[in-house]
Amino acid sequence: DALNEYMIPKYHIEVEFLPLQYAEYQQTIQLMISGGDELDVMPIYYSNASSWIAMNGIVDMNQYMDTPEGQAIKDVLGEANATVGSMNGILFGFPAQKESVELGGLTMRADICDELGIAEEYGLELNQDEYTGKVYDWSVATEIFKKVKEAHPEMTPLYLQGSASPMRRLAFFDELADQFGVLDWEADHDSTTVVNEFETDTYKEAVTQLAEWFDAGYIYPDALTDTQGSAVMMKAGNTFSYMSAIKPGYLVEAKASTGTDCYAMYFGQDVEGGYSTTNVSFYDTGIATNSADPEMAFKFISALYTDPEVMNLWQNGIQDVNYKVLDDGTAYYVDGEDASNFKYHQNTGWFMGNQFNTYVWNDGSKDANYWDKLQHHNDWAQYSPAYGFMWDSSEYSTQITALQNALNTYRPALETGSVGVAGVEETLQKLNDALYAAG
């Protein structure tokens, strides 16, 4: 009601939300599109874009980009990011303002790092997780794992599991939406040649490194089949570290999930990190063709990116009723409410609109400058030469399913190191033979 009290006089728009659980989002939206149900503004996960466009379910917003509202979106996102949610010339959505570059590394137990002198050697500190340009080669991790293994043979230096690929932490490929045909960023930042990721030297070197760690006893021996997860294993004291994407405020989240203080170290071959289309255009905000008034829907989308009052009302509710602004400029629950009993609070700005226009929520990991820190984090990255390209795979769904099945057969063993160094060549050959056989 408060949002409409603001929207109606200013924009002549009345808003009605349709709350959905994440698990039901894709099916519900798809049924609404195909069934002709009235639907205006919607989040679009990048992998759904091709099929929903093929269903004629998404409005091409190019027609609105020369309007004042379209220009306002470009002013916020920049020209490149404002048009990144495009396929076959159709502008289907705008990306959320969020951290979009994946700078990866290790999350490590602070007590073990302190005990073994690792923290002192590398200048590690609690809650020091902002990227400053300092990045380490993975050979440094080998030395750290060796120290931990010698001092604590009962503990696994590195936890991996077969269901969660670590490849994005080890090497950056522009996966061009589905990774069956990629740009090998590590080999050549400027190349636009599409290659088979699993035949590249970059991929082979990465899985060989994992196999060496596995043979040395540095990786959890049941990594291929284990389902417990890194947080559970660290909380139980069974592992020293795990691979993760790191960003400002990350270590507070890590402590909450693992129950222990952690340090973070950035690792990788590529110092800057890379921007691919799907890094930025992971979730987009678009308009359904079922919309009763696409032009007004576009004006609402523009408000999500340009009007702080709209985003704060949607995300935080009414000031001094649902949240209060603290002396440091951050927002928090009103007196008498907390995470267990709040009446209204969203945490969805990361997938729709411009969360940088909202108050930073004081969860213990962030200060009022947090959005500036995320933008600075993004600014380290370089754009892939294929940035803005998203392959339309809708005509190849059968082949992609067969390729995915082939990949799932061999990838977990390779990417947990479980094949050992002796098995890398043979398993890679089997994987590529299966991929070519699948089309």
Predicted region positions:
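Extracytoplasmic/secretory soluble proteins
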Residues: 1-439
